[in-house]
């Protein structure tokens, strides 16, 4: 934890070979994973572990994440993840992140919106249901609350592939893990596109939780000024909408 404030959490992660893609660059899902792990550690440091939350039937549900990338990390790099709560607005909590390399250069920054939920009823809980006080950190800010992803209605989408939620994708709530959605988005692009384009970020809104056995039709747009839009849908529901931020 940061020595200057108990409200700012810092945690180090080493990039392993299994965290990288065929180009030896860190996967987008790896960044989402270490951000999630750092956020869990930050809350645990305040006296509320994930285990105790699960016993109480509570959990955190990410709603929207907006990540900007300067570059993807390389194998064996040591990364410092900084994360802090910016407090809540009604039932919604905002959490920011910055990721630095060993030289202190920022690789990525992100804004996110979360909700505290009753795991059994899948209902959003009021902040007062949290048995600890999560004070906001006010010394830094990545930005305002991220907007919900809106795919332009006139933008044509085509099915890239279909994905079925299985054992390897599940989290401890038996839903598809948040970080895995980044893999679903990245898999919508052909290798030729990854050779030609540079990833500069991800903007994603999680609409419905995907359960074991559910099939997701992953739809994508062509390249736009913003990047490639991706939607996961199936069974008459939309699971997520996202924009892979890309440039030539």
Language-model regions, residue ranges each:
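Short, well-ordered turn and helix-capping elements at secondary-structure junctions
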Residues: 17-19, 69-71, 167, 203-208
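HotDog/MaoC-like acyl-thioester-processing domains
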Residues: 2-10, 66-151, 206, 210-212, ...
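Hot-dog-fold acyl-thioester-processing enzymes
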Residues: 1-62, 109-111, 118-200
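Alpha-helix C-terminal capping segments
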Residues: 189, 220-221
């Amino acid at each position: 934890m940061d020595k200057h404030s108990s409200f700012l959490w810092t945690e180090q992660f080493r990039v392993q070979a299994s965290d990288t893609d065929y180009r030896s660059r860190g996967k987008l899902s790896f960044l989402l994973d270490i951000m999630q792990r750092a956020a869990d550690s930050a809350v645990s440091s305040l006296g509320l572990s994930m285990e105790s939350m699960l016993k109480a039937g509570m959990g955190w549900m990410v709603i929207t994440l907006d990540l900007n990338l300067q570059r993807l990390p390389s194998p064996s790099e040591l990364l410092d993840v900084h994360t802090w709560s910016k407090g809540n607005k009604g039932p919604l909590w905002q959490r920011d992140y910055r990721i630095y390399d060993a030289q202190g250069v920022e690789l990525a920054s992100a804004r996110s919106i979360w909700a505290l939920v009753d795991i059994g009823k899948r209902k959003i809980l009021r902040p007062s249901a949290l048995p600890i006080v999560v004070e906001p950190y006010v010394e830094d800010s990545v930005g305002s609350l991220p907007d919900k992803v809106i795919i332009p209605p006139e933008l044509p989408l085509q099915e890239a592939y279909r994905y079925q939620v299985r054992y390897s994708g599940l989290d401890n709530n038996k839903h598809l893990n948040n970080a895995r959605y980044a893999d679903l988005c990245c898999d919508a692009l052909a290798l030729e596109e990854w050779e030609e384009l540079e990833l500069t970020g991800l903007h994603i809104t999680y609409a419905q939780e995907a359960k074991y056995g559910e099939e997701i039709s992953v739809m994508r747009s062509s390249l736009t000024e913003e990047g490639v839009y991706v939607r996961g849908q199936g069974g008459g529901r939309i699971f997520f909408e996202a924009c892979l931020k890309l440039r030539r």
